[in-house]
Amino acid sequence: MRFKKGNRWKNSGGQLRYKTWRKNVFELNKRKIGLSRHYVCIKCNKKRKTTRVLHAHHIFSWDKFKNKRYDKSNGVVLCWKCHNGFHRKYKFEALDNPSLLIEYLGKKGNLVKEYINNDR
């Protein structure tokens, strides 16, 4: 699912900030998992040496939670298959409801709960 961000996105430096956020989410994922050479999907545990087939997914929606957009803790790493599976299952309900991500991740949802609890 892609959102058109338009000129507001381009003119605000959003592309660079987003790329930096994405990179930081991947690096934080590696540290939390304890790996130095691989990136891991939080849902299915598939390891990848590159981020090409992995997605950084916002816990709190990019669109609705502007103050959390570029917070590196506001992201989890999902492989393409798991990321699309999440959005197919929950569609737009998930945009402002992080508890759906926790439900989708099952036991791994504790990492998301940890972020939400630390944010309060």
Locate the predicted segments by residue.
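The −1 position to Zn-ligating cysteines in a subset of zinc-ribbon hairpins
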Residues: 40, 55, 78
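Cys/His-coordinated zinc-binding microdomains
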Residues: 45, 60, 83
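Short, charged surface segments at domain edges that flank catalytic/cofactor-binding sites
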Residues: 5-43, 67-69
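Canonical RING-type zinc finger of E3 ubiquitin-protein ligases
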Residues: 50-56
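Short Cys/His-centered divalent metal-binding micro-motifs
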Residues: 49, 75-96
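Short cysteine/histidine-rich metal-coordination sites, predominantly Zn2+-binding motifs
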Residues: 58-64, 94-103
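Charged phosphate-binding loop/patch that engages nucleotide di/tri-phosphates or the phosphate backbone
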Residues: 97-120
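Short linker/helix segments within small regulatory modules
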Residues: 60-74
